[in-house]
Amino acid sequence: MTKKIPRIVLAINYVNYSDVKKKNWQKIAMDVMVKNSPSNVQLVTFNYKDDEVNVPQQFRVFKMLERNSQKTIGNTRPLPYVKDIFDFASQMNCDVFGYLNSDIMVHKEFFDVFDNYKKIDSYLFNRIDIADVSVATFNSKNFHIVWKDHPGFDGIFFRRKWWLINRKRFNDGLIVGEPEWDYYYNKVIRQSTGQIIKKRKLHHVYHNTIWNLTSNGAVNNRKINGAVA
């Protein structure tokens, strides 16, 4: 019997950065996604209707986001809610779907982890921080590792059937791009009865970002995460 190849949706939230370096890191990451994604992977970005979106043509653009944390809670940035992204992705024709931060890079073998998707419900991916790269140097693995033990999760994926049954376990109020939303998802996934895979499969160009822990979005996420043991 021929093994079924999973249909995968890889979603990002494209950011129209004004910072030239951040814009370039995001572009390289998207180009890497295009280069390394097999034919069974759909690349998509979810954005607001008025967003200026400049992605490679292989990405499908869905301007479906409505909830905006700047409007709902007075956040300093107009950031979306992570569950909205997961919910939109789960409505697509797929077996597995997930979200990556838009400046994350993956090698071709990243997608091998989904081969056994019928038995795995959730996937949590950590990153390795590396020095500046081009698409070619990243794919040749000719790069310098700066930090190999980053604790956060820059990518989370789900088996679609599991998510549709269990989505109510997850709080609606967590905001992408603010601290601790990923820690919250890790906790709730870990408390579920599903089968979980955790891997350090992602790469990211290192830059010394300091979280604004007093923003309304950060306070919101930390409060929700702190309420879960």
Functional labels for PLM-detected ranges:
Residues 40-49, 121-125:
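Short, hydrophobic beta-strand segments that form beta-sheet elements in well-ordered domains
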Residues 94-107:
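Short beta-strand-to-loop acidic/aromatic patch adjacent to the donor-nucleotide binding site
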Residues 6-8, 31-45:
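Short loop->beta transition adjacent to catalytic acidic/histidine clusters or analogous donor-positioning motifs
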Residues 2-30, 167-229:
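C-terminal catalytic/acceptor-binding lobe
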Residues 13-14, 33, 44-50, 104, ...:
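Preference for well-ordered, secondary-structure-rich cores of eukaryotic proteins
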Residues 19-22, 49-55, 131-134:
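Short, charged/polar "capping" segments at the starts of alpha-helices
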Residues 45-95:
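Active-site-proximal specificity loops/subdomain of glycosyltransferases
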Residues 75-78, 86, 104-187:
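Conserved catalytic core of nucleotide-sugar-dependent glycosyltransferases
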